């Protein structure tokens, strides 16, 4: 699984050379692409980022941490969300806001809000699922969410992410 932001795209090391070249040709020239080596390959579950900050799984190597920082052009922080290492599964961010697992502690909220300088809120998707990564895709212009998401969940996303009209 791949993940990225407006500056770069990260793919797991098992992506073939042909796939890598196809991705590289498909992206604008100013977008970097990088391969992450090692046992962590579900990158969307293990990295949550916007254009300034990347929260990453605590077990990423220093070498991979440097690749993430360089390719995405962000500051990198090893952390957990609601005491879970799968930060990309339990949080989603754009450049204006972020949603996190409902069990996130007040300390974690404050730390994230101070670190990222954006509003942070608790959320669920698809009628109460806490697995945000399985049902939310967001950038600064639009939000996609699972078809079972309730109007209250969608309203919450719209308020937190402040997507452009």
State where each predicted segment sits.
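The feature marks the mature, well-folded catalytic cores of soluble enzymes
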Residues: 1-165
């Amino acid at each position: 699984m791949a993940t990225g932001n407006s500056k770069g795209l990260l793919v797991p090391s098992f992506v073939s050379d042909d796939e890598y070249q196809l991705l590289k040709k498909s992206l604008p020239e100013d977008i970097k692409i990088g391969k992450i080596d090692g046992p962590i390959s579900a990158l969307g579950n293990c990295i949550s980022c916007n254009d300034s900050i990347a929260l990453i799984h605590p077990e990423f190597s220093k070498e991979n941490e440097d690749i993430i920082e360089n390719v995405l052009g962000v500051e990198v922080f090893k952390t957990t969300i609601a005491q879970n290492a799968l930060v990309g599964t339990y949080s989603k961010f754009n450049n204006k806001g972020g949603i996190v697992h409902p069990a996130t502690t007040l300390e974690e909220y404050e730390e994230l809000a101070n670190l990222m300088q954006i509003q942070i809120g608790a959320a669920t998707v698809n009628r109460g699922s806490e697995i945000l990564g399985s049902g939310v895709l967001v950038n600064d212009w639009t939000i996609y969410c699972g078809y079972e998401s309730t109007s209250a969940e969608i309203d919450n996303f719209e308020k937190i992410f402040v997507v452009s009209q």
